[in-house]
């Protein structure tokens, strides 16, 4: 929808060129329902992740620090979902005021950048740990990981500033309702393009290429170990985890990124047909739902792929205190979205042809 701004008041009045764009009754039922499901499962799952990592795993590894911050970033976003569920259920009537409009919108943007930056750092950490296990030990320290997380939170905050500044509530005169959206000056094309393309490039394309490259190099290293290892079960598990990470990340975000780019074209008046605008505005909430499932399902990667995480998770469910462990010698190493693969992969010699352990 492309607004034309007419007056400047406490609540600015706008006129919408395509007033029926994206306004369908089934959206007002389906999308809030999906948001509610994501909220319940996401809050429960990510809260368990925080408890397990912080209380049971004790932040002993670099990966655990990144994973804890990833779960916290997801929680920061998830607490805003009830607002968006209500907003959609009320047919895009925003009743919560300008402050919550800005904060809830910034929460989405902040989570997008924080999550993708953390996943990128996790992929780089996995690459260094597996491909360069000895050389990387000096750089892969707990201190460096904590500083990196602080920098990521700051960068995500900076990237979300335009949302806080330019997202406001407006009164749509021909819709007779108050909406929460962006206000663009008619001649300000830089902001329109910048917000959309930054989400496309910084929030998806560049991180995805880094993640894909990192895990491709990891797989090549594991493939070499395949050729001289008798028992491939553990390597198969790692490979499945790698494929799941890349596949899930790409396919959960690509629909939203494509329609975000189309929305930029609409804002630039490259696309002016209201029928196409309606398709974009109708599809956008559903692409957002697909992307939001990333926040909801991340914890299940830990359970399915993380043997140590699964052990601690079961302890938590059974109310076993963190200091009680049936296998105290087990490590807490995890991977980027599951267990952490071995710190040092030993390429077996003839005497140790069946080993593939972590130090």
Curated annotation (Swiss-Prot):
Residues 56-61, 126-141, 217-239, 305-359 are cytoplasmic. Coiled coil: none annotated. Disulfide bonds join 18-274, 101-180. GO terms for molecular function: angiotensin type I receptor activity; angiotensin type II receptor activity; bradykinin receptor binding; protein heterodimerization activity. Keywords: Cell membrane, Disulfide bond, G-protein coupled receptor, Glycoprotein, Membrane, Receptor, Transducer, Transmembrane, Transmembrane helix. GO terms for biological process: calcium-mediated signaling; cell chemotaxis; G protein-coupled receptor signaling pathway; inflammatory response; kidney development; maintenance of blood vessel diameter homeostasis by renin-angiotensin; positive regulation of blood vessel endothelial cell proliferation involved in sprouting angiogenesis; positive regulation of cytosolic calcium ion concentration. GO terms for cellular component: plasma membrane. The keyword Transmembrane applies. SMART domains: 7TM_GPCR_Srsx (SM01381). It is found in: Cell membrane. It holds the Pfam family 7tm_1. Glycans are attached at residues 4, 176, 187-188. Its main location: membrane. Angiotensin II binds at residues 17, 167, 182, 184, 199. Gene3D superfamilies: Rhodopsin 7-helix transmembrane proteins. Residues 1-25, 90-98, 166-190, 269-278 are extracellular. The chain crosses the membrane at residues 26-55, 62-89, 99-125, 142-165, 191-216, 240-268, 279-304. C-terminal Ser or Thr residues may be phosphorylated. It is a multi-pass membrane protein. SUPFAM superfamilies: Family A G protein-coupled receptor-like. InterPro entries: ATII_AT1_rcpt, ATII_rcpt, CCR1-9-like, GPCR_Rhodpsn, GPCR_Rhodpsn_7TM. Receptor for angiotensin II, a vasoconstricting peptide, which acts as a key regulator of blood pressure and sodium retention by the kidney. The activated receptor in turn couples to G-alpha proteins G(q) (GNAQ, GNA11, GNA14 or GNA15) and thus activates phospholipase C and increases the cytosolic Ca(2+) concentrations, which in turn triggers cellular responses such as stimulation of protein kinase C. Belongs to the G-protein coupled receptor 1 family. This is Type-1 angiotensin II receptor. The gene is AGTR1.
């Amino acid at each position: 929808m492309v607004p034309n701004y007419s007056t400047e008041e406490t609540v600015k009045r706008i006129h919408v060129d395509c007033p029926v764009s994206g306004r369908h009754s089934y959206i007002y039922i389906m999308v809030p329902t999906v948001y509610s499901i994501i909220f319940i499962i996401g809050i429960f799952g990510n809260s368990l992740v925080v408890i397990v990592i912080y209380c049971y795993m004790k932040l002993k590894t670099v990966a655990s620090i990144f994973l804890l911050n990833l779960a916290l970033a997801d929680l920061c976003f998830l607490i805003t979902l009830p607002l968006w569920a209500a907003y959609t259920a009320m047919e895009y009537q925003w009743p919560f005021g300008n402050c919550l409009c800005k904060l809830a919108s910034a929460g989405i943007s902040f989570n997008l950048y924080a999550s993708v930056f953390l996943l990128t750092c996790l992929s780089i950490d996995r690459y260094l740990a597996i491909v360069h296990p000895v050389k990387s030990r000096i750089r892969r320290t707990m201190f460096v990981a904590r500083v990196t997380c602080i920098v990521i939170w700051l960068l995500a905050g900076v990237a979300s500033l335009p949302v806080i500044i330019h997202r406001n509530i407006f009164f749509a005169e021909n819709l007779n309702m108050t909406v929460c959206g962006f206000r663009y000056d008619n001649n300000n094309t830089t902001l329109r393009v910048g917000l959309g393309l930054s989400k496309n490039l910084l929030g998806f394309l560049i991180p995805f290429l880094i993640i894909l490259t990192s895990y491709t190099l990891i797989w090549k290293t594991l493939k070499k170990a395949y050729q001289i290892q008798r028992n491939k079960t553990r390597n198969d598990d790692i490979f499945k985890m790698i494929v799941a990470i890349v596949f899930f990340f790409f396919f959960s975000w690509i629909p939203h990124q494509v329609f975000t780019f189309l929305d930029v074209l609409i804002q630039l008046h490259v696309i002016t047909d209201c029928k196409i605008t309606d398709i974009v505005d109708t599809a956008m909430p559903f692409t957002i739902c697909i992307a939001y499932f990333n926040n909801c399902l991340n914890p299940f990667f830990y359970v399915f792929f993380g043997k140590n995480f699964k052990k601690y998770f079961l302890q938590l469910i059974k109310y076993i205190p963190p200091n009680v462990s049936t296998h105290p010698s087990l490590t807490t190493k995890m991977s980027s979205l599951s267990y952490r693969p071995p710190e040092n992969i030993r390429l077996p010699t003839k005497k140790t042809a069946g080993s593939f352990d972590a130090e």
